[in-house]
Amino acid sequence: MSYQYDRYLAQHKSNVEAGFRWLQKNLPEITEGSGAEHNIVFAHDQSKTEPDEYGPYDIYFYGGNRSYAVVEDFRKAWLLHIHRNPHHWQYWILINDDPEEGEIVLEMPYCYILEMICDWWSFSWFKGNLLEIFSWYEEHKNYI
């Protein structure tokens, strides 16, 4: 286990919670009755502690090695992560093998939308620029 990655995970979860607490305090109408609090405060990204995610993430971000094998292992771990965590928008895309159906975007429940926003916003909290989420979204919106 990596001290650096453990520290990152703790900080990330703390920042996700900080975003949610800010929303609760300043925009309570969007959090009340959402059912999002448990996932955001207690269970966010819990799967990142699973060995098949933890190891590849740790090596990719903190191992100082971006070999083909390391990158492939990370990509597999990322795929596992988004399929285990419904706060990722990719979780809600159904890729069919029937060409007439193609890709179908399913409706994402509101509680996971809140968690997704807090997840994105957590990086703004880390950087100390709470408005950074808007420029990030502007850069990525056409791919989401």
What do the predicted segments below correspond to?
Residues 1-144:
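Metal-dependent phosphohydrolase cores
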